Regions:
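N-terminal leader/targeting and pre-domain segments
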Residues: 1-394
C-alpha cells in the first residue's frame, strides 16, 4: 500500500504523490493531489505562516482553536464536511473557486485581520450542502462574489463590523451570488458596506430585524421567492459621503415582499424596479438623514403588478412616486407625509385608497390617470395639492 508523503506528514498533511514546495514558513501543494487530512495545529507548531493548495481533492480539514496561518485553497474539491464552530481566524482565509460537497459550519467563530489585503473570501465557490455562519463575527472584508449556494444558507445573528473610510469601497460582497434554496439573514448587524447587486434569490430570503448601518446595494437583484425585510433598519449612518446609500433600483421581485415596519433613515432608491406580486410597506418610516435634509426617496418608474400596501407610513422625507404603473389595488391609508410627495404621470389601473391620510406639505398628482376608484375620504391637505391634467375615469 502506498504510504503518505513523509515530508508533508511532518506538517500534519496526509497525502500521496503530491507535488509540493516547502520553504521555511510556507507550504504549497498543487496539481491533483489527494489529501486525506490537513491538521492546522501541527502546521502552526511547525512554524508555518502560509498554506496554499491548488487543484486538489481534500477530505478532512481540522482547524486549530486559534488559526493564524494565511490560507488559500484554489480550485479545490472539499469532500467532507467542515466543522469550524467557535474558532478564531487571525489571517487571510481564502477559498477560491472551490466546491464544497458537504455541510460547512463556521457558527460562533471570529474572523479578524489587521490589514485590507488579508480578508475572508469564498469567491466563485459552489456549496452543495447547507452553510452555517450563525453568530459569526467578521472584522475583515468578506467576499462571496459569484458563489452558488445550492442548499440553505444561514447567517442569523452574524456581525459584519469592518469599516473603511473610502467611498465606494465594498467591505462585504455577495455580488452576483446565486441562492437556490432558502437564505436566512435574521438579526444581523452590518456596519460594513454590503453589496448584493446582481444576486439571484431563487427561494425565500429573510432579512428580518437586521440593521444596515452602512451603504447597502441590491441593484439589479432578482428575488424569485418570498422576500422579507420586516422590522429591518436601513440606517446608513456610515460613509455619509456616499451618494447612493440604500439601493433597490432595477430590482425584480417575483413573489410576496414584506417591508413591514421597516425604517429608512437615508435616501432609498427603488427606481425602475418591478413588484410582480403583493408588497407590504405598512408601518414603514422614511426619515431624513442626519447629514442631508434635502434627500429624496425614489420610486420613479416602478411597476406594481399586484396589490401594494403603504398604510400607516410616516414620510419624514420627500418621495418620488412619479411615472409608476399600479396594476393592483393601492392602499395608502392613514399615512402622514411631512415632506413633499410626487405622483405625477402615474397610472392607477385599479382602485387606490388614501383614506384619512394627512399631507402636511405639497403633494402632486399632476397628469395622473385613475382608471377606477380613487378614494380621498377623510384626507387632509395642509397645502393645496396639484391635480392639474389628472384624469379620473372611475
Amino acid at each position: 500500500m502506498e504510504e503518505f508523503d513523509k515530508k508533508l506528514e511532518q506538517y500534519g498533511i496526509l497525502t500521496k504523490n503530491a507535488q509540493k514546495s516547502i520553504e521555511k514558513d510556507r507550504v504549497k501543494i498543487f496539481n491533483n493531489a489527494i489529501i486525506e487530512t490537513i491538521n492546522f495545529k501541527t502546521l502552526q507548531e511547525k512554524g508555518i505562516k502560509e498554506l496554499h493548495i491548488k487543484k486538489s481533492e481534500i477530505y478532512n480539514i481540522v482547524f486549530s482553536k486559534e488559526n493564524d496561518i494565511s490560507v488559500c485553497f484554489d480550485e479545490c474539491l472539499i469532500l467532507k464536511q467542515i466543522n469550524a464552530e467557535k474558532l478564531l481566524f487571525k489571517n487571510k482565509f481564502n477559498f477560491i473557486k472551490c466546491i464544497f460537497h458537504e455541510k460547512i459550519d463556521f457558527s460562533y467563530s471570529f474572523f479578524s485581520t489587521t490589514c485590507i489585503e488579508e480578508n475572508v473570501s469564498f469567491k466563485e465557490c459552489t456549496f452543495k450542502f447547507n452553510v452555517f455562519f450563525n453568530e459569526t463575527r467578521f472584522e475583515t472584508h468578506v467576499n462571496f462574489e459569484e458563489s452558488t449556494f445550492e442548499k440553505q444558507v444561514i447567517f442569523n445573528n452574524a456581525s459584519f463590523l469592518n469599516q473603511e473610510t473610502e467611498i465606494n469601497y465594498i467591505e462585504v460582497s455577495f455580488l452576483g451570488a446565486i441562492f437556490k434554496d432558502r437564505a436566512y439573514f435574521y438579526n444581523i448587524t452590518f456596519k460594513s458596506m454590503i453589496d448584493f447587486s446582481y444576486a439571484i434569490f431563487e427561494n425565500e430570503v429573510h432579512f428580518c430585524n437586521t440593521y444596515f448601518e452602512s451603504v447597502v446595494h441590491f441593484s439589479f437583484t432578482k428575488f424569485k421567492g418570498v422576500c422579507d425585510f420586516s422590522n429591518t433598519k436601513f440606517l446608513a449612518t456610515q460613509k455619509k459621503e456616499e451618494r447612493n446609500r440604500i439601493c433597490f433600483d432595477d430590482t425584480e421581485f417575483e413573489d410576496i415582499v414584506h417591508f413591514y415596519s421597516a425604517k429608512f433613515e437615508s435616501k432609498v432608491l427603488f427606481c425602475k424596479s418591478v413588484f410582480k406580486s403583493k408588497v407590504n410597506f405598512n408601518g414603514a418610516e422614511f426619515s431624513t438623514s442626519h447629514y442631508d435634509d434635502a434627500e429624496i426617496n425614489n420610486f420613479d418608474n416602478v411597476t406594481f403588478e399586484s396589490d401594494a400596501w403603504f398604510n400607516d407610513i410616516i414620510f419624514n422625507s420627500s418621495v418620488l412616486f412619479s411615472k409608476c404603473e399600479y396594476k393592483g389595488n393601492i392602499y395608502m391609508r392613514n399615512i402622514t407625509s411631512k415632506q413633499q410627495l410626487y405622483f405625477y404621470e402615474s397610472l392607477f389601473l385599479s382602485n387606490v385608497y388614501f383614506n384619512n391620510s394627512h399631507f402636511k406639505d405639497y403633494v402632486s398628482f399632476c397628469e395622473c390617470e385613475f382608471e377606477k376608484t380613487a378614494c380621498f375620504y377623510g384626507v387632509k391637505f395642509d397645502k393645496t395639492p396639484n391635480f392639474s391634467q389628472a384624469i379620473f375615469k372611475g
